[in-house]
Amino acid sequence: MKRTFQPSVLKRNRSHGFRARMANKNGRQVLARRRAKGRTRLTVSH
């Protein structure tokens, strides 16, 4: 049986990366929340 997680850095960054988050309003809200919480890494790419 094939595993469900087949890692790809490109797909990961395109969906969850910093530029993807900045591209729309809700993504920017995600970043704002993570900054407020004090996360060291805001996104997987950054």
From Swiss-Prot:
Alphabetically, the GO molecular function entries are: structural constituent of ribosome
**The keyword Translocase is annotated on this UniProt entry:** no
Keywords attached to this Swiss-Prot or TrEMBL record, sorted alphabetically, are: Ribonucleoprotein, Ribosomal protein
Q: Which domain of life is it from?
A: Bacteria
InterPro entries from the entry? Ribosomal_bL34, Ribosomal_bL34_CS
- Report the Pfam families cross-referenced here: Ribosomal_L34 (PF00468)
Give the record's GO biological process terms.
Answer: translation
Cellular-component GO terms for this entry = ribonucleoprotein complex; ribosome
Q: Does the keyword Protease apply?
A: no
Question: Per its UniProt record, what PROSITE patterns does this chain match?
Answer: RIBOSOMAL_L34
Q: Which family does it belong to?
A: Belongs to the bacterial ribosomal protein bL34 family.
Name listed for the protein in its UniProt record: Large ribosomal subunit protein bL34
**UniProt source species:** Hamiltonella defensa subsp. Acyrthosiphon pisum (strain 5AT)
Gene name, per UniProt, is rpmH
